[in-house]
């Protein structure tokens, strides 16, 4: 089922039960595959994904780490979509996660965090999140683990 929500920019239909990020954006990993396929069929150029990421409400746990399994799952699903494209000979030549470190989001301030590295805005201390180590392994081994 759907429900209609009104916003200043447009009317948006939200499917009930669809997973969403902390920014309330839908999580739609198949969209990356279909976008790569469409753009390749239309323009016949290689694809570089320059920004793909998920906002989350992250915090430092009592063990001093930042555990973000939702972000790992998000990236894993989107990379699987790109792998599907590569398997179909769509020329995907790059993928950049947004963002390496938590930062100031123009519309949301410091509440929502996109980074693979947690930033304590008071002390400027950086703490690599679980997703940082997972993504480093993906890059090192050139495969989704």
Where are these regions (language model features)?
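Single conserved hydrophobic/aromatic residue that forms the stacking wall/gate
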Residues: 1-9, 13
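Amphipathic, non-transmembrane alpha-helical secondary structure
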Residues: 29-33, 37, 41, 72, ...
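C-terminal substrate/ligand-recognition segments
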Residues: 18-56
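Aromatic-rich peripheral "rim/lid" segments of glycoside hydrolase catalytic domains that contact
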Residues: 57-67, 73-77, 84-85, 91-145
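Short, well-ordered beta-to-alpha junction loops that form the rim of enzyme active sites
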Residues: 4, 52-53, 100
């Amino acid at each position: 089922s759907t429900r209609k929500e009104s916003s200043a920019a447009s009317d948006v239909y939200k499917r009930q039960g669809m997973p969403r990020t902390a920014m309330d954006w839908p999580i739609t990993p198949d969209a990356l595959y279909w976008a790569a396929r469409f753009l390749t069929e239309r323009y016949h150029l290689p694809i570089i994904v320059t920004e793909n990421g998920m906002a989350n409400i992250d915090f430092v746990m009592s063990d001093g780490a930042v555990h973000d399994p939702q972000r790992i799952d998000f990236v894993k699903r989107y990379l699987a979509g790109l792998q599907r494209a590569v398997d179909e000979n769509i020329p995907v030549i790059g993928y950049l996660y947004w963002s390496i470190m938590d930062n100031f989001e123009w519309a949301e301030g410091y509440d929502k965090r996109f980074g693979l590295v947690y930033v304590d805005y008071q002390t400027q201390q950086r703490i690599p999140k679980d997703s940082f180590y997972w993504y480093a392994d993906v890059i090192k081994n050139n495969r989704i683990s």
